[in-house]
Amino acid sequence: MDESAIRALLDTTFAPWIRDLGLTPASSTDTSVTLRLPNADKLRHVGGVICGQVFMAAADTAMIVAIAHALGGFQPMTTVSLTTSFLRPVKAGDVLVTANILRRGRNLIFGEIEVHDENGALAAHATTTVMLLA
């Protein structure tokens, strides 16, 4: 999938509230995709930092996009597990969310996601298992 196909996937496959995050493709390899998450007031809680729920949604979305990219297009799939560690708060600047496929089995795909702030510092780390449904 090229950048325009990834943009189309983001625009047509996900729920409206995920589209409202404003994720855009930043880069990709055969087994990974990096999405840019623009920092916006609507993503921050009272403490002024981006909510952890936003990082988890962006991480899950990035992994689905990385899998679709590796498969050459979207297939029905579901997240089986997503374990996230929040390492530092992000108050300002865009965030880069990189999903990397670690192992692809017949039905299960294992991956990890890193969320970096604008300075490249690791803000969150997640591991995930996704099941292909078709």
Question: Which residues fall in each region the model found?
Answer:
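Terminal targeting signals and extreme-terminal segments of soluble enzymes
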Residues: 1-134
